[in-house]
């Protein structure tokens, strides 16, 4: 079972295209040893949005001689893709057939009282003394995957304490991530903020009939 922590920098929120990609290949779930790493830049076919420029500081003119964004592929042995809000990065690279492990969902489940669950906020929560240095290059893809690995270590410690034993393997971590992604509170609509378990049955039925309903909200409503 092969797992990669992956992060991307993109052209922005509107039909995003890849401009920078980074990954860490993890040797095992026990100590999260890094067996190899990658960082590369890619040329998009559209202009980078100002909001993305302000985040990544990657300029269009720096990418002129880079390979096309369409040429990027994860290594062939990829089975598990790990990331903070991993679905975004997974979507940018074309929705490949990998099992996705979301550190953001696991963070929300493990530390529900935190006022923010961004990766940077989680680094401050768990590595307060080192956080300023660790986050100096936040939103640079390679720094982000390295920080995600640090967060993943704390997630595994917290899960081990909760389970009474270490997480067995990537497959179990994926199952725990899938469970964490199923919400307990509705975050939209007229019942925003209500426990899903307490929603009126007719409203639940109406939501389940919506074709574009988030699949994890659908799971929560179907319980």
Regions found by a protein language model. Give the residues of each.
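Acidic, Mg2+-coordinating catalytic module of metal-dependent nucleases/exonucleases
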Residues: 80-87, 91-93, 121-188
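Generic structural signal for hydrophobic core residues of well-folded globular domains
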Residues: 110, 126, 155, 207-211, ...
């Amino acid at each position: 079972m092969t797992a990669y922590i992956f992060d991307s920098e993109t052209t922005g929120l509107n039909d995003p295209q890849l401009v920078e990609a980074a990954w860490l290949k993890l040797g095992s779930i026990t100590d999260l040893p890094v067996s190899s790493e990658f960082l590369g830049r890619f040329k998009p076919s559209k202009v980078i949005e100002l909001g993305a420029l302000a985040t990544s500081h990657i300029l269009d003119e720096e990418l002129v001689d880079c390979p096309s964004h369409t040429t990027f592929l994860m290594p062939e042995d990829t089975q598990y893709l790990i990331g903070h809000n991993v679905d975004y990065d997974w979507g940018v690279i074309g929705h490949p057939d990998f099992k996705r492990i979301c550190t953001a969902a696991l963070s929300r489940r493990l530390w529900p009282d935190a006022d923010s669950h961004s990766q940077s906020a989680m680094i401050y929560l768990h590595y307060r003394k080192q956080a300023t240095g660790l986050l100096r290059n936040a939103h640079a893809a390679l720094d982000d995957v390295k920080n995600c690995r640090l967060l993943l270590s704390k997630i595994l410690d917290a899960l081990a304490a909760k389970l009474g034993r270490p997480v067995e393997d990537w497959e179990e971590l994926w199952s725990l991530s899938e469970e964490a992604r199923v919400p307990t509170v509705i975050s939209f609509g007229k019942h925003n903020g209500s426990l899903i378990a307490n929603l009126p049955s007719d409203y639940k039925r109406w939501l389940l009939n919506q074709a574009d309903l988030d699949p994890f909200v659908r799971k929560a409503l179907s319980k």
